[in-house]
From Swiss-Prot:
GTP binds at residues 70-73. GO terms for molecular function: ATP binding; GTP binding. This is Nucleotide-binding protein RER_30260. Belongs to the RapZ-like family. Displays ATPase and GTPase activities. Signal peptide: none annotated. Keywords: ATP-binding, GTP-binding, Nucleotide-binding. Gene3D superfamilies: P-loop containing nucleotide triphosphate hydrolases. ATP binds at residues 19-26. Pfam families: PapZ_C (PF22740), RapZ-like_N (PF03668).
Length: 299
């Protein structure tokens, strides 16, 4: 493996992901994609070096490449040594992630999805237990060469995600991405909303002639809405609810949230309140906020 001191001169992170069938390789691949890695699944060992070369010369170049290989790729001991030796000549920082689980857990997982082990399909071993045992033998040296071994026997999907994020993510990957979306109830609820708040309890600027042509993005409407009784208290209280929800999302490995803020037409109150809420959320370093005014301009 490449040492940490050598990493500084290397231009791409390369992660070889392998392990036992049923140990969570597919989940790991999805997590790495969410973390911004370019993921190639089940790539034959003889094509790995070519994939690395193409990634280094692509425009723009790939900063982080992960290749997921399981027993179907026939990654035997000799293949692994040859691949890693060849990669040492490339300007990359190489790491190996190995996923495993206990026999009883693997058997239960295969039985739950009613699938046979890959080695059973090839006729190498007749029973599920024998297929798992054969795979362990084939990948023993791969495991010994790994930089990180994760036993997924007792892990739920979000717990595996957290471990992978800790090992292979960065600060940007751990940022919660929040979209605050204003809307008008008369046009229907946003289908992608995780949270919905109703600000129709506030007086409607629509009924004030000098404010009616303006929107919640204009200072006069914004000041009017936010100065109404209960507006600031509502924002403070709702911010606390959002904080609790974000904490729960993080525990579950979720990194995206959409908050829908609705009024009657999506022009005045919801626009002003959604922007005020977004300002409150945007003050946190680990939250990235974007604003969408879905129905602004429809009237």
């Amino acid at each position: 493996m490449t040492t940490d001191s050598a990493k500084d001169s290397r231009t791409m992170d390369f992660l070889l992901v392998t392990g036992l069938s049923g140990a969570g390789l597919s989940t790991a691949a999805k997590v790495l994609e969410d973390l911004g890695w370019y993921v190639a699944d089940n790539l034959p060992p003889e094509l790995i070096s070519r994939m690395v070369g193409l990634s280094l010369t692509s425009d723009p170049p790939v900063d982080r490449l992960a290749v997921v290989i399981d027993v179907r790729s026939r990654l035997f001991t000799g293949d692994l040594g040859w691949v890693l030796t060849e990669l040492e000549a490339e300007p990359i920082h190489t790491r190996v992630l190995y996923l495993e689980a206990s026999d009883d857990v693997l058997i239960r997982r295969f039985e739950q999805v009613r699938r046979s082990h890959p080695l059973q399909n090839d006729g190498i071993d007749g029973t599920l237990s024998e297929g798992i045992a054969a795979e362990r033998r084939q990948l023993a040296v791969v495991k010994a060469a790994a930089d990180l071994v994760i036993d997924t026997s007792a892990l739920k999907a979000h717990q595996l995600r957290q471990k992978i994020e800790t090992a292979f993510g960065n600060d940007a990957n751990r940022t919660m991405k929040v979209t605050v979306q204003s809307f008008g109830f008369k046009y229907g609820l946003p289908m992608d909303a995780d949270l919905v708040c109703d600000v129709r309890f506030l007086p409607n600027p629509h009924w004030i002639p000098e404010l009616r042509p303006h929107t919640g993005q204009d200072a006069d409407v914004r000041d009017y809405v936010l100065s109404r009784e209960g507006a600031e208290d509502y924002l403070d209280t709702y911010r606390h609810l959002v904080d609790l929800t974000i904490a729960g999302y993080r525990r579950e490995g979720k990194r995206y949230m959409t908050i829908a803020v609705g009024c009657t037409g999506g022009k005045h109150r919801s626009v002003a309140m959604s922007e005020a809420l977004a300002r409150r959320l945007g003050s946190e370093d680990d939250i990235s906020v974007s604003i969408v005014h879905r129905d602004l301009g429809r009237e």
